[in-house]
Amino acid sequence: MFPPCNVPVSNMIAQSHPFGQRYAFVVVGVIFLCLLVAAGLRSAPAVMMLPLENSFGWRRDIISLAAGVGILLYGLTGPFAAALMERIGLRRTLLASLVVMSGSTALSLLMTKPWHLFITWGVFSGIGSGAVASVLGATIVNRWFKTNRGLVMGLMSASSASGMLVFLPLIAALAQSGGWQPVVTAVAIATAALIPVVWLLVPERPASIGMVRYGAEADDVPPTSPASQGNFLAHTLNTLRRAAGTRVFWYLFATFFVCGFTTNGLVGTHLIAFCGDMGIGEVQAAGLLSMMGIFDLIGTTLSGWLTDRYDPRKLLGVYYGIRGLSLIYLPYSGFSATSLIIFAVLYGLDWIATVPPTLRLANEAFGDRSGPIVFGWIVAGHQIGAATAAAFGGTMRELQGNYELAFLIAGMTAIAAACISLLINTSKPAFEPEPQAA
């Protein structure tokens, strides 16, 4: 479907050696853009919820359920995408995902019934964006960096915040002036524009251009996953089976389930609608999310720096604790300008700040070879939590007429996750790595 990953682009890069080892940061920049656009795609249903409701008369719980399907498949695709990147190549996997994302989004312009929404924005965009997620960042970090991994993962995790920062005000303005169709068009074009950028600038791995990982010596040999030599599907499931027999996996899975439940599942999907119930317009509510995005960009980058230096378990405890208190505060805030700014700052600082310490704990427990795939399954837990919250929030709104109880429950689960984080122990490997093929 796509040209071999080392011809001709990697040959040209190898001949010119642009930036030396620092070319790793060029790759990070391109992947950051991919993650940013994927975050914009995943945040679009929050802006489209009211326009779709007004345009088609669809109930909010139905629209929320479609968004939840997309979030769920986004997460479940991740671990298979991580193994597929090892089996057929990162470039091919990423390019195919961008094609699916752009195509399914554009196809939704023709939708007239709820099942069309489920197919385009639920199934296909969920699967397509699943490979352009945290597992992609984890794979890039392990392939391209020997040092500064926490900082780089923090930067790439912050792309979710930047996606909100860049896309939400734009698509909210488009939705307010023209309905849901301009939003769909903008997302489809932005996704399609990344395809040639990835093809031109992202080699398969440092060795493809005659380099080693950033911060590594010339004789560095990066770890290779067994998925690159065998059945990637079997390896992905076998890694899950082995990881599921360990306590540390379930602690990480549970806390990341709560992370998804309390971020893109509830706040990302329902905050704009919650603000609408309180008399705040879509553009103003999107501006609030953008402000949160600014502080998350700061908080997640700082979290990556802190993860390289401090106990990640304690960091997670602090992050989840602050998040829980913020969510409990919001329903009682009065939704004044000052109170919403306070919420945006406190909540925004740790929106995605949990990713760098969670990845470090996964790599410490399961190793560099299995770590990204295990992390993919942990991210699946995140998205199961997010999908649950997306559907739960819409159902609570239909049953009670407001979102207050949904946000209070989410806050309490975050505080529980803070306590669980302190129980995680990665002082010894969770299981022995599989033998590496010769």
Where are these regions (language model features)?
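Helix-loop-helix hairpin linking two adjacent transmembrane segments in secondary transporters
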Residues: M156-S208
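Intracellular juxtamembrane helix-capping segments at the cytosolic ends
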Residues: L52, A131-F145, A353-F366
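Cytoplasmic helix-loop-helix junction between adjacent transmembrane helices
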Residues: W121-A158
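Interfacial helix-cap and linker-helix signal at transmembrane-aqueous boundaries
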Residues: L52-E53, L84-M85, V166, L170-G178, ...
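Extracytoplasmic gate region of multi-pass secondary transporters
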Residues: P45-M49, R241-T300, A389
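C-terminal transmembrane helical hairpin of 12-TM major facilitator-type secondary transporters
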Residues: Q284, S290-D296, L302, T307-L361
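Conserved MFS/SLC helix-loop-helix module at the cytosolic interface between two early adjacent transmembrane helices
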Residues: L76-W115, T307, R313
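Hydrophobic core of transmembrane alpha-helices in multi-pass small-molecule transporters
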Residues: L36, S104, H116-A131, F257, ...
